[in-house]
Amino acid sequence: MSPLALSTCWNSHRHHDGYDMLQEIRQLGFPSVELGHGIRYSLWPGILKAWETDLIKIQSLHNFCPVPTGVVRPNPNAYEFSDPRPEVRRLAVRASEETIRQAAKLGARGVVFHLGSAGPEISDKLESLYEKGRYLSRAYTDAKVEAVRKRKENFEYIWPRVKECLDPLVALAGELKVRLGFEIREVFEEFPHEEEFPAVLDAFPPEVVGYWHDFGHAARKEFLGWHSHLETLRLRSPRLLGCHIHDCRRPSDDHLPLSHGEVDFAALLPFVPKDAIATLELSPRTPEEQVIASRHLWNSYVADSA
């Protein structure tokens, strides 16, 4: 498996120099990095210096990277391919093109994509019911059934909108030899949901587009009864490009260091291809020693599964 990378989502917020940001990650023992969606343009000169001097390998970028001009607060959903406004979709495509071009320049293997939203808003309600001990109550199941019904209606107009945006981006990525990973999202209302993934992935060539698994996101959905984490990973394994690694406590406390949650990595790891990109994506609040401990734990899981 690819050497474990650390996402800059852990430390980009506290750095003004991109070289120093990447040097901090390298000094923690990580040979590679994912440039997260919080990378400001001011960090870019230092990032290029680190890349040119072989300080660290850049495995992947998370769209949008760098943060688009005009976006005040870094947000991977600042512009969405699903937005009903054509001008916003154009901004999403333009910012994504920039990410793909930068990934190609840096020799990154892939770019992580969020594809948008399709509603309905249901996750906060389900998590609230869960925390009140009403998981699988009548109110809980009725809310889920109605959400699924509405989502099937929404898919019919959301998916063509998203695909229209993705078509030129997939073409550009193919031309530049960069792969795109469509990420499993943490809430039902984001697109695509697990049942929608086959149609989305099948629309694009596997040599360009893959699936991006996120262990914490998949756990959150499993806790709310949307899917089986193991079964989803098993089904998507043939198209799996990479994964975000973090632990999660039910129902929604994710981006935790490994062993601080309930994700059974040992059971899931056999379904992760040996050549997959592996990225530790931890909360900025994670202490340095827990970042290092998570790296050691992941490497031990990989060794045990070999």
Regions found by a protein language model. Name each.
Residues 2-26, 41, 46, 52-54, ...:
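Histidine-acidic metal/acid-base catalytic patches
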Residues 1-9, 64-81, 119, 139-149:
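N-terminal small/glycine-rich loop or linker at the start of catalytic domains
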Residues 35-55, 115-122:
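Glycine-rich, proline-tolerant flexible connector loops at the mouths of alpha/beta enzymes
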Residues 31-37, 181-183, 279-281:
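Short catalytic-loop micro-motif centered on adjacent basic/acidic residues
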Residues 43-62, 128-141:
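Short acidic, glycine/proline-enriched helix-loop-strand junctions
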Residues 24-43, 73, 78:
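N-terminal substrate-binding region of glycoside hydrolase catalytic domains
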Residues 31-32, 57, 109, 179, ...:
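Residue-level detector of anion-binding/catalytic polar loops
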Residues 81-211:
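Active-site acidic/histidine proton-transfer and metal-coordination neighborhood
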